[in-house]
Design a protein with these regions (language model features):
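Membrane-embedded helix-loop-helix hairpins and adjacent transmembrane boundary segments
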Residues: 1-613
Length: 613
């Protein structure tokens, strides 16, 4: 291990020797946290009871399509920075190194993809629901199939969003995790249900400010306590945390290539093709506002997320040679962040409360946006076709859907507590269908000859194939054929006497195993493999990319088996601007820069009939 880390003002040992009370919230911390929740609830009450806006469905879901640029941009950033990001990404950097930053850097190519390829299609077709585009381009079955995958993802992921910050709160307060989860989820459901999209966006602005303040303060204070930036980089380099991996083996846990390509697919899917974000993008007055908002959001996202990734490096450098996980003071990496905060900031009045507010702000912003869009999708795709629609009835039903889903999130916490690696679990779950969803949208925009039958079967083929691959990968994990051992740290630099006594006691009761002549096991690790190549061994970072590739691998040849009807007139506005010159129809003359989205009522009048008939 490296040289002495005498610069550390405190060590794991001093924390271990501290009383339980020293690792708990102070009264000031509780006040800070309560103020954050109260501000969020207050915004919901304002837009629910005192705002002068019309009580229409369009107002509830899209803010009357008059939302301002900067708040929407901040809201887009906030909703991408879930509590999982705040807790698990630093843990990922701490245990596996800084390569996770490549997934963050993928936002750089994602923004122009959204601005010039995807969002123009939505605005030119006056789409208020991104899944509406699939019905226009293919058929209603394609739309319903993709909305089912959206609903499945929400059921799987929403409990995770709230459980992770509850874990952090429990770590520093000792309060039961499920009690915290119940209280905070209820607050989120309350303001989302009352205030609609305006409450979601403006609470995201408040919560985004809390997140920015917290992340910057943690990075600055952590660097200062470690001995400066040069010491952070020195320790991280010696510990292998700054060894960037450019290998092309897809079995490696995360590399430059898997980070960039999977990140590009993930951010394109989450920001540009997921209704929770598209709903806010199309709530802006025009395409020009949407471009500005996406550009601002991209810059803000990169700033906060790079800081978040680097906090993991700071934590490693701070605990270099004195790992609290190995010492048994932290049960798993996902709990390390709040422990670190208490260690370096516990003596600063209110600062632990600010950080926990940051983690909850991140989760609340993700949960509120998802609940609002989930209610809209469920109502318009599955309830509205079967009832007599009125704005009052629609708003009432959507509020009820939000309440039911909030209750499910609370109960889902009992399942999430059994997950080992939160970030790996999330990437694995979303890997089942995210690639298929992104793939079918890109098919619609880039492959004019692709028919509805090809699109539907392509989605099914991709999802079934990915499910098969992921199930077999989990079997390999259980069998020990895939094992993601973390990068090494140690306990040899712990200098405090109390901790050394514990360490000596452990060593005194440990025997050295007899040497064995057995060959090393055939296993795939995070950093290499001595097994024959198997598709089941590929890193979970590649799942989204593989899912999209499978859609195209099926759709391109099958588009010659089931071609589009030659008599069917192709609408060039349904395709990306980059492929319209391939069509045998003139390019539409559209002044898009200042073109607002039409309201649903206006579209209904133009069509002469309701689409849900």
């Amino acid at each position: 291990m490296a040289a002495s880390t005498s610069e550390l003002p405190s060590t794991v040992a001093t924390v271990a020797a501290a009383t339980v009370e020293n690792l708990r919230f102070s009264g000031t911390d509780y006040i800070v946290f309560t103020l954050m929740l109260s501000a969020s609830a207050g915004i919901g009450v304002y837009f629910g009871f005192f705002s002068k806006s019309k009580n229409t469905t369009e107002e509830y879901l899209q803010g009357g399509k008059k939302m301002p640029t900067w708040p929407v941009a901040i809201s887009l950033v906030s909703s991408q920075l879930s509590g999982v990001a705040m807790m698990s990404i630093p843990a990922e950097s701490y245990t596996f190194g800084f390569n996770i930053v490549f997934t963050v850097m993928a936002m750089i190519p994602t923004v122009p993809v959204l601005i010039y390829i995807i969002v123009p299609v939505f605005y030119e077709n006056n789409v208020s629901n991104c899944y509406e585009y699939l019905e226009m381009r293919f058929n209603k079955l394609t739309r319903q199939l993709v909305t089912i995958t959206f609903i499945m993802n929400q059921f799987l992921m929403l409990p995770v969003y709230m459980f992770v910050p509850s874990l952090a709160f429990s770590q520093v307060t000792g309060i039961n995790i499920h009690l915290i989860n119940t209280v905070v989820s209820s607050v989120c459901v309350f303001y989302t249900m009352l205030g609609g999209i305006k409450a979601v966006v403006w609470t995201d602005v408040v919560q985004g400010g809390v997140m920015l303040l917290s992340v910057v303060l943690v990075a600055i204070l952590g660097t200062s306590h470690t001995g400066g930036l040069s010491k952070v980089l020195e320790n991280a380099s010696e510990g292998g945390r700054l060894d960037f991996n450019f290998g092309i083996d897809p079995r490696l846990r995360v590399t430059f290539w898997s980070g960039i390509f999977s990140g590009l697919l993930m951010w394109t899917g989450k920001v540009g093709l997921d209704q929770s974000c598209v709903q806010r993008i199309v709530s802006l007055p025009s395409y020009t506002h949407a471009k500005k908002s996406l550009l601002i959001a991209g810059i803000g996202f990169l700033f906060i997320m790079i800081f978040t990734c680097f906090i993991g490096i700071i934590m490693f450098s701070y605990y270099y040679g004195c790992d609290p996980i190995q010492a048994g003071l932290v049960s798993k990496p996902d709990k390390l962040m709040p422990f670190f905060i208490q260690d370096i900031m516990g003596h600063l009045i209110g600062m632990p409360g600010v950080f926990i507010s940051c983690v909850f702000s991140a989760s609340l912003s993700s949960l509120s946006a998802s609940l609002n869009s989930f209610a809209g999708v469920v109502y318009f795709d599955y309830i509205k076709p079967h009832i007599r629609h009125t704005d009052a009835r629609a708003n009432g039903i959507m509020k009820l859907v939000i309440i039911v889903m909030g209750a499910y999130c609370i109960l889902g916490g009992y399942m999430v507590q059994n997950f080992n690696s939160i970030i790996q679990t999330m990437w694995t779950i979303t890997g089942i269908n995210t690639g298929a969803v992104v793939g079918v949208f890109l098919l619609g925009m880039f492959v004019p000859r692709c028919s509805a039958k090809v699109a539907v079967t392509g989605i099914i083929f991709s999802v079934v194939a990915m499910l098969w691959i992921i199930i077999n990968a989990q079997i390999n994990f259980k069998a020990g054929l895939i094992r993601y051992d973390v990068l090494p740290n140690g306990l040899d630099q712990c200098e405090a006497r109390d901790f050394q006594v514990i360490l000596n006691s452990i060593n005194g009761n440990t025997t050295t195993p007899a040497p064995t002549m057995e060959a090393p096991p055939q296993v795939t690790t995070a950093f290499g493999s001595n097994r024959d190549f198997s598709l089941y061994d590929i890193s979970f970072y590649w799942y989204k990319v593989l899912g999209a590739i499978l859609v195209f691998a099926w759709a391109v040849p099958m588009s010659y088996v089931w071609p589009t009807d030659k008599e069917e007139k192709q609408n060039p506005k349904l395709y990306s601007p980059f492929v319209r010159n391939m069509l045998n129809v003139p390019d539409p003359v559209v002044e898009m820069e200042e073109m607002p989205l039409k309201s649903s009522d206006l579209k209904a009048k133009e069509n002469g009939t309701s689409q849900d008939a």
